[in-house]
């Protein structure tokens, strides 16, 4: 139980700490993982003397104030090495990948909350004259408010579809052990983290805008979404670092995984051509642009040359991939409902 750095809810607190042994080399290659308890545990399992750990201060944060972030001081503390020596970062990244998926979901969750909060406000806030309800409606009748709400809803659906696709890839990788699924799960992980958190930040900002002046007043609660979600682009690996990981390590297969996803999108576009030809042509051109971008990045053998455009590439890839996933999910639901004889119910919904 390590929440909040220190507490008296349990007999002991166990900290996982990255540190370097005295005889290990400098840099990240020399980092090992240590278990550092608040109290030294005796041989018989009972709690012994206090270890050299103390809480230096509690940070005053912009948001997520329900979680205390502490400065911990380690003074001649005793730690126990976990796992192989100098493999601490490898062990940490196992945890980090899971955390990145969770943080992406956190961004989506805050976005959904901000959207619902804003929708309720727009349905009840009377301001100005309505052009569609005998001049006595609420701000949801205003075109720009509707635009923002529709944008929020679409972006949430898109980011959620990416996270679900990543979850599917992880499940399939665990079930089959096939390299294709393993690589896809790894490829989508930084995308899930970045896209979900960036969407959360953008949507919570739109939520403040929909509230107008009241959004700047703490009473409405709209500002809290912005404060709380802002850190998601920072912790568990900043979004910029995630984007660099995508165009770097995640493309060490010469773009094979990226091309596989692009080919899946092309299949969807080809199937769409018989229904919406004009739209399929535009999507086809965009998909080829995405393919050309991957080819350009792969051509830069010096990975650092890819980093300048890493973030725009990740967001563009996520937006386009989510378009095909969410459209596929929608069409699949349409087919399912009609096959179940529920066409009337579908149309009503």
Task: Show the residue positions of the predicted features.
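Glycine- and acidic
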Residues: 1-2, 12, 52-57, 89-106, ...
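A short core secondary-structure module
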Residues: 1-50
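A glycine-rich, basic-preceded beta-loop-alpha segment at the flavin cofactor/substrate interface
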Residues: 3, 41-56, 61, 68-99, ...
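Alpha-helix capping/hinge segments and adjacent helical runs
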Residues: 64, 183-263
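Mobile "lid/hinge" segments at catalytic clefts and subdomain interfaces of large enzymes
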Residues: 99, 106-110, 114-122, 247-248
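Helix-rich, typically C-terminal accessory recognition domains appended to large enzymatic cores
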Residues: 150-168, 194-211, 238, 246-247, ...
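C-terminal helix-coil-helix/basic helical segment that borders enzyme active sites and/or dimer interfaces
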Residues: 157-193, 294-308, 333
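C-terminal amphipathic alpha-helical interaction region
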Residues: 253, 271-329, 333, 339, ...
